[in-house]
């Protein structure tokens, strides 16, 4: 039985903030994001930051003479690539974000999905190799960290009960963490939200609309994974999930005040 609970400061739920994409290669973008995070935390809303680091993983794999393959938007992870992927995500990407947090005056703690029994993990699909699927398990470690006013920075690396290191899609990792702490989920990407066939921002979507846009190829690949993760949380927790851009970090402050930014993924209305 998962030990999940609502962790909040006052009336504000934890903001589970997923970052990744090109952000990790943009010092100014990271600086602005951490400045916004510092203000949100100072205003009484805790943040858990979850990250991927696909661009860095691709670079490191190429440097080691390895190729990247994706299946339906998810990275195929053969055993021989695990040391490179774990090093890029749990190592370099995690500490790059932590360095930006420290520079912005945010006290943070670098961790992975494997820490303190917060998640259970298993292989998602043998076709994907060592790609993990995680379920919320125990929130007590995160509860302690947040009670100190610290910001967890969580890499999307998990470990199974068999001791296998697993690469978890960061959007799916953020989904599990939002469920674990009953938090509000914000998925940041390189674009401003979900765009229609003409490149215009769609302000709100539910499952039926997502299915239609997926069928005609407007939502595909990485955005498809992101939207499906958002729908999972929206429907299981009965609350909207935001998909927005890290390029407009100040919008997060507006979001913490209850305003809408990017695309809202809505629970299906019965």
From Swiss-Prot:
Q: Which SUPFAM superfamilies did the record assign?
A: Carbamate kinase-like
UniProt-annotated binding residues for substrate: 53-54, 75, 167
Q: Does the keyword ATP-binding apply?
A: yes
The EC number of this protein is 2.7.2.8
* Role summary: Catalyzes the ATP-dependent phosphorylation of N-acetyl-L-glutamate.
| Catalyzed reactions per annotation | N-acetyl-L-glutamate + ATP = N-acetyl-L-glutamyl 5-phosphate + ADP
Q: Where in the cell is it found?
A: Cytoplasm
Its name, as the record gives it, is: Acetylglutamate kinase
Q: What is its main location?
A: cytoplasm
PANTHER family referenced in this protein's UniProt entry, alphabetically: N-ACETYLGLUTAMATE SYNTHASE, N-ACETYLGLUTAMATE SYNTHASE, MITOCHONDRIAL
What are the residue positions of the site described as Transition state stabilizer?
18, 226
Task: Tell me one GO biological process term.
Answer: arginine biosynthetic process via ornithine
């Amino acid at each position: 039985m998962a030990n999940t609970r609502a962790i909040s400061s006052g009336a504000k739920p934890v903001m589970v903030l997923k970052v990744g994409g090109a952000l990790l290669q943009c010092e100014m973008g990271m600086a602005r994001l951490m400045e916004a995070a510092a203000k949100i935390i100072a205003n009484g809303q805790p943040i858990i930051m979850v990250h991927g680091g696909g661009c860095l993983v691709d670079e490191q794999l190429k440097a080691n003479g390895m190729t990247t393959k994706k299946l339906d938007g998810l990275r195929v992870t053969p055993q021989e690539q695990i040391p490179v992927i774990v090093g890029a995500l749990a190592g370099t990407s995690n500490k790059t974000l932590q360095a930006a947090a420290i520079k912005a005056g945010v006290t943070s703690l670098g961790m992975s999905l494997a820490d303190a029994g917060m998640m259970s993990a298993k292989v998602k699909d043998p076709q994907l190799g060592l790609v993990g699927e995680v379920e919320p398990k125990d929130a007590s470690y995160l509860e302690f960290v947040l009670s100190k006013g610290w910001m967890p920075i969580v890499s999307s690396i998990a470990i199974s009960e068999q001791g296998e290191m697993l690469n978890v899609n960061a959007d799916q990792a953020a989904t599990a963490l939002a469920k674990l702490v009953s938090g509000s989920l914000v998925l940041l990407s390189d674009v401003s939200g979900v765009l229609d066939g003409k490149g215009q921002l769609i302000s709100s979507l539910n499952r039926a609309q997502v299915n239609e846009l997926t069928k005609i190829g407007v939502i595909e690949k990485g955005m498809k994974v992101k939207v499906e993760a958002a729908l999972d949380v929206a429907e299981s927790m009965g609350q909207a999930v935001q998909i927005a851009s890290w390029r407009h970090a100040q919008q997060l402050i507006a979001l913490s005040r209850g305003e809408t930014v990017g695309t809202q993924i809505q629970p299906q209305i019965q």
